[in-house]
Structures are given as structure tokens and as C-alpha cells.
């Protein structure tokens, strides 16, 4: 579509144009039923079929083992900062958390309201530019689980491997990396992910939880946050965000049509490599993150003169490159390269950056 621009927003992020066109075509009359899917009962046979198919496709894409439940819940990933410790409280009154940036710090602060948090490793001392080596972690023997954030969207720091935490359940906030590459789900106890990066629109959160962890919830856990209750009710304890669930299902179909997460891994690696290579070769732009832990999904960068920041953003928008401003807490620029952002968007961004640098060096 000629009027579609390239959206580099960190979230809510770009959605596949093909998905939006299908949703548009079905908006008023879903598959000849005479009503929108937004108007349909979540307990109707038609919507239940949509929900079941979405879960089946997600399981196939992520190779989710049979002994894991997939939950479609509400509240965003931030709600999971409380849900995780409350659902796992009876594993132990202490948990290990790895601090690699703003989102892991938020998870630490919230969990600290319900149990003792041991910050087993922190990137604070290196300015959150590098993930602490596994040999530096100080895991607690009494911890019930270990939590980490594989990708920090604001700082642009990412774990490129799954950390080994022994027999402790590993919990991960995969909001910004889910579906971007294959993952060995069996290495985890719980994975959660807000939808608005690689899954679909905001309003939905996916939780993957190993079945044997469903019986460890706090007795005071609110019903709507209880993984076991959600599992027993097929994620429909109350009315779910049906439109977000439906759109997520369309995204899963789109991903399968593109070759699945294996194909996305190659594309995403290529997109990130292109942009980092240009930044590293440039004397006008810089990326502060250590080479060993640069994010594929979120690429922060600065200009050599920050007085040019607003000019850069204004001209980029005029060139059809949207939402490149860095997070308000760190400034600078940030290009988010989620699945739905095509490779030509990265090529267009690099072309603009070259032109801007040439005119403002």
C-alpha cells in the first residue's frame, strides 16, 4: 500500500500489512456470519474455534512441548511481574533475578512486594552496556526460581543464549523476542510475553507454563492472575480480549506462511547486522552496547551532536520513517526491528542516515 510508512516503534509495533488487510476485509462481516468478530460471544463455537486454532498454530511455531500450557491472558507483561512470584510463591520465599536494564528492574521491584528478591547479577556497574558473565552470577540455593529479561527494549541489550541455572525453574520475560527465532521451551519453567511486539496488538499476553508448576500459587493469589485457573478454563475465566486474540491468530498464520520462526531468525539477523554494520562504520552515529550482547530487536544509537536529534527525527518522519525517538529515559534514537518490519525498511533507514550524515557532518 503506497501510503503505508515504516514504523520503528518499540511497542505497540508494526503489524503485517497482510494481517491488517485481512482484518479490514473481515471487520464488518466475519466469514459470512453477518457480524464482526468483535461482536461475537467468546463462548460461541466460532470464536472457540478461532482461539483453539491460534493456540495450535502458536504451539507449532514455537515447538511448545505437550507438558506446557499456553495461556492467553490480559493485563500486559507488567501484570506478570506480580503474577509470576504469586503463582510460584510456594516454591520458596526467595527468588533470583538478573538485572540487565529498566524492564528487569521493574520486575525486581514488583516481585519484591511478595517475596525476598536476590539480585544475583546486575549490569549496573557497566552502565547496562553488557550482560554480566554467567560465572559472576550469585544464585541462591534457597531461591524458588530464576527470572531474567532476554531482551531489554530500552537499552538494547540481549542475551544471545539461554542461561544455565541448573534445576531451578527459569522464568523469562520474552515480550520483545518471542517468535523472532527458535527457542528451546523445555529449558524454561515460565515464559511470558506482551503481545504488542511480535504477537499482535496490545491487550493480550501469552504465558507458557510447565504443568508441574501450576500448583505452587499463593493462597491469596487473585483468581484472575492464577495460571491454574486460567488453564482449567481455557483462558476464558472471564471475557478475554477477543479481537486481540483473533489478530494474534492471523499473525501466527502469517508467520507460518513466511516459513516460521526459523525463517524469521535469518531475516531478523540480517536486518540487525545491516544496521549495526552501518552504525559501526560511521563516524556520525554510535551504538553504546557491547558486541557480545547487542539486541536484534531494538537498536539504540546516538548522533555525534545531540543538538541534531530533533532535526533527525523530523526529517526521518518526512521520509516515511516513523517512531525512531529513543525512550524518554535514555534519549537518542532507537530502531525497533520486530518481525513485521520488512527488510526494505532497514535499507530505507540506512539510506536516510547516510544522507542525513552527509548533509550535517
From Swiss-Prot:
Catalysed transformations (reactions): O-phospho-L-serine + 2-oxoglutarate = 3-phosphooxypyruvate + L-glutamate; 4-(phosphooxy)-L-threonine + 2-oxoglutarate = (R)-3-hydroxy-2-oxo-4-phosphooxybutanoate + L-glutamate
- Name the UniProt key words of this record, in alphabetical order: Amino-acid biosynthesis, Aminotransferase, Cytoplasm, Pyridoxal phosphate, Pyridoxine biosynthesis, Serine biosynthesis, Transferase
Give the EC number(s) under which this enzyme is classified: 2.6.1.52
Q: Which PROSITE patterns match?
A: AA_TRANSFER_CLASS_5
Question: Binding residues for L-glutamate, per the UniProt record?
Answer: 43
Give an example GO molecular function: pyridoxal phosphate binding
Pathway info: Amino-acid biosynthesis; L-serine biosynthesis; L-serine from 3-phospho-D-glycerate: step 2/3; Cofactor biosynthesis; pyridoxine 5'-phosphate biosynthesis; pyridoxine 5'-phosphate from D-erythrose 4-phosphate: step 3/5
N6-(pyridoxal phosphate)lysine PTM positions read: 197
The UniProt record lists the keyword Protease: no
- CDD domains attached to this UniProt entry: PSAT_like
InterPro entries attached to this UniProt entry: Aminotrans_V_dom (IPR000192), Aminotrans_V_PyrdxlP_BS (IPR020578), Pser_aminoTfrase (IPR022278), PyrdxlP-dep_Trfase (IPR015424), PyrdxlP-dep_Trfase_major (IPR015421), PyrdxlP-dep_Trfase_small (IPR015422)
Family recorded in the similarity comment: Belongs to the class-V pyridoxal-phosphate-dependent aminotransferase family. SerC subfamily.
What do we know about how this protein assembles, alone or with others? Homodimer.
Function noted in UniProt: Catalyzes the reversible conversion of 3-phosphohydroxypyruvate to phosphoserine and of 3-hydroxy-2-oxo-4-phosphonooxybutanoate to phosphohydroxythreonine.
Protein name stated in the entry: Phosphoserine aminotransferase
Q: Which gene encodes it?
A: serC
